[in-house]
């Protein structure tokens, strides 16, 4: 796995955020905003891991975000982050039925996020896009791109915005998405792969938390 300088800086930043959130959790386990930051950092860090570790880290992120929801059930940013985690996880899976289970969960959480914040255009577009995800996953796997990634081991986080051109992105082995969201006081790039980039490239950050 090769990292650019920007990748390495992001890795350090989010690892620092993860450690800070872990320490803060010991002081105040009922801080839902801290749990949101923790889950967001794990979501970002999963991009830099080999596939098996990335899946575990995504599950850990979901766990932290679900815990935030037990404290604040209406926290729509957490719902949206969980949906992105399930989407990323689905693209790490070759079996279409197993992937569909993750996509279905992603759709459920995108819908819940939109229900909590119905004026959020990003949530609405995310929900619309998620309905097309299983078909894109199948195309991705049929074209052999999925086997390249699933058999390749490492994550492919790239610095800055990932290219919207799928073939160019795959050659560079980038799996960033252009989902961007400002939920933790910084911009997080939701992890994913080039197929999801093509679907999500027009999305911008949601409004600040209410």
Swiss-Prot record:
Distribution of this protein across tissues and organs: Expressed in roots, flowers, young cotyledons and leaves.
UniProt modified residues of type N-acetylmethionine: 1
According to the lineage, what is the superkingdom? Eukaryota
Explain the consequences of disrupting this gene: Slightly delayed flowering time. Triple mutants tom20-2-tom20-3-tom20-4 are viable.
Residues crossing the lipid bilayer are: 179-199
Q: Which UniProt keywords apply?
A: Acetylation, Membrane, Mitochondrion, Mitochondrion outer membrane, Protein transport, Repeat, TPR repeat, Transmembrane, Transmembrane helix, Transport
| GO MF term set | metal ion binding; protein-transporting ATPase activity
Q: Which residues lie on this side of the membrane: Cytoplasmic?
A: 1-178
Residue ranges, annotated region (Disordered)? 151-172
Q: Which GO terms describe its cellular component?
A: cytosolic ribosome; mitochondrial inner membrane; mitochondrial outer membrane; mitochondrial outer membrane translocase complex; mitochondrion; nucleus; TIM23 mitochondrial import inner membrane translocase complex
Q: Which residues lie on this side of the membrane: Mitochondrial intermembrane?
A: 200-210
Annotated TPR repeats reside at 42-75, 83-120
Q: How is it modified after translation?
A: The N-terminus is blocked.
Q: What compartments host this protein?
A: Mitochondrion outer membrane
Spell out the Pfam families in the cross-references: TOM20_plant (PF06552)
Please report the record's description of how this protein sits within the membrane.
Single-pass membrane protein
Enumerate composition-biased segments (Gly residues).
151-161
Quaternary form?
A: Forms part of the preprotein translocase complex of the outer mitochondrial membrane (TOM complex) which consists of at least 6 different proteins (TOM5, TOM6, TOM7, TOM20, TOM22/TOM9 and TOM40). Component of a mitochondrial large protein complex that contains, at least, MIC60, DGS1, TOM40, TOM20 proteins, and petC/RISP.
Q: What does this protein do?
A: Central component of the receptor complex responsible for the recognition and translocation of cytosolically synthesized mitochondrial preproteins. Together with TOM22 functions as the transit peptide receptor at the surface of the mitochondrion outer membrane and facilitates the movement of preproteins into the translocation pore.
Q: Would you identify the family this protein belongs to, as annotated?
A: Belongs to the Tom20 family.
Q: What is this protein called?
A: Mitochondrial import receptor subunit TOM20-2
Which gene codes for it? Answer: TOM20-2
